[in-house]
Amino acid sequence: MGAQFSKTAAKGEAAAERPGEAAVASSPSKANGQENGHVKVNGDASPAAAESGAKEELQANGSAPAADKEEPAAAGSGAASPSAAEKGEPAAAAAPEAGASPVEKEAPAEGEAAEPGSPTAAEGEAASAASSTSSPKAEDGATPSPSNETPKKKKKRFSFKKSFKLSGFSFKKNKKEAGEGGEAEAPAAEGGKDEAAGGAAAAAAEAGAASGEQAAAPGEEAAAGEEGAAGGDPQEAKPQEAAVAPEKPPASDETKAAEEPSKVEEKKAEEAGASAAACEAPSAAGPGAPPEQEAAPAEEPAAAAASSACAAPSQEAQPECSPEAPPAEAAE
């Protein structure tokens, strides 16, 4: 439109009236609300408005139609058309979010200054606000889903992986420690039992040996005393030999009778020694205490007691028959 008017303006002053007439004639026919190539926000395309616009243009500079057309064009461009305002305001809403360039910020500023209360601007702002509000909602909706997913994954990790590993390690450690501890305690207990048993056996063996020695000592003393008495008997028996000589046959019978009780006493002594050895046998179970060593001291007092028991009847028999007393002792 501006180019067409500039071409007509070059023909002469008569062209000055044509733009107004053309505007008046063309304005009623434009039902879509377009004028000078721009969209009107209010949709007012009445001929009165067109005439007023044409008169203002003619009054501004009637002698220079070309300048008149250029100035309205400049004014229209500077006033920022409604379409530019519509486009600028959504850009303004998007600018703070995306950090728009200064050029975009200037354009929306002009658009807002030109038509701040236009419905389209309000609609654009509402749309931008809705988009801005919806975008956080979308972000919120997107963020909860990963947040919900991540805790599930974490729960799975905690419940299955970490706890299972920890429980596995703990069970393994417990089993190993329990096994090692049990094994260590078992040998310790066994060693303690062995030591206790060995100590008890050794103590019993020592006690038995001591008792055997004590019993053997008096037995030996008694035997020594009996031997001394037996040694002194022959001296006393010498004067009696003459009186006893004719009685040799009955004396021999008496010696036999004396030997029989001595044998019985020997058997009793052997049985007593066997019983003592049997009593001390359990104590010999401990290590380092062989039964032979304990049985030997037990047999010694038994032998001493047997010898003393045998010596007594021999002494009794010696006064009766002194010549046969030494062979009786030798036989014993």
Curated annotation (Swiss-Prot):
**GO (cellular component) term, any one:** actin filament bundle
List compositional bias (Basic and acidic residues) regions by residue number. Answer: 250-271
Q: How does it sit in the membrane?
A: Lipid-anchor
User: Where primarily located?
Assistant: membrane
Which positions are lipidated as N-myristoyl glycine? G2
Alphabetically, the GO molecular function entries are:
actin filament binding; calmodulin binding; identical protein binding; protein kinase C binding
PTMs per UniProt: Phosphorylation by PKC displaces MARCKS from the membrane. It also inhibits the F-actin cross-linking activity. PKC-mediated phosphorylation increases 4 to 5-fold upon TNF-alpha or LPS induction. Myristoylated. A proper myristoylation is essential for the proper distribution to the plasma membrane.
Reply yes or no: does the keyword Transmembrane apply.
Answer: no
User: Which residues are annotated with the PTM Phosphothreonine?
Assistant: T143, T150
What keywords were assigned to this record?
Answer: Acetylation, Actin-binding, Calmodulin-binding, Cell membrane, Cytoplasm, Cytoskeleton, Lipoprotein, Membrane, Myristate, Phosphoprotein
Phosphoserine: modified positions: 26-27, 29, 46, 63, 77, 81, 101, 118, 128, 135, 145, 147, 159, 163, 167, 170, 262, 314
The subcellular localization recorded is: Cell membrane; Cytoplasm, Cytoskeleton; Cytoplasm
Calmodulin-binding (PSD): region residues: 152-176
Q: What does this protein do?
A: Membrane-associated protein that plays a role in the structural modulation of the actin cytoskeleton, chemotaxis, motility, cell adhesion, phagocytosis, and exocytosis through lipid sequestering and/or protein docking to membranes. Thus, exerts an influence on a plethora of physiological processes, such as embryonic development, tissue regeneration, neuronal plasticity, and inflammation. Sequesters phosphatidylinositol 4,5-bisphosphate (PIP2) at lipid rafts in the plasma membrane of quiescent cells, an action reversed by protein kinase C, ultimately inhibiting exocytosis.
Q: How does it assemble?
A: Interacts with CDC42. Interacts with GTP-bound form of RAB10. Interacts with calmodulin/CALM1.
Query: Under which name does UniProt file this protein?
Result: Myristoylated alanine-rich C-kinase substrate
Q: Which gene encodes it?
A: MARCKS
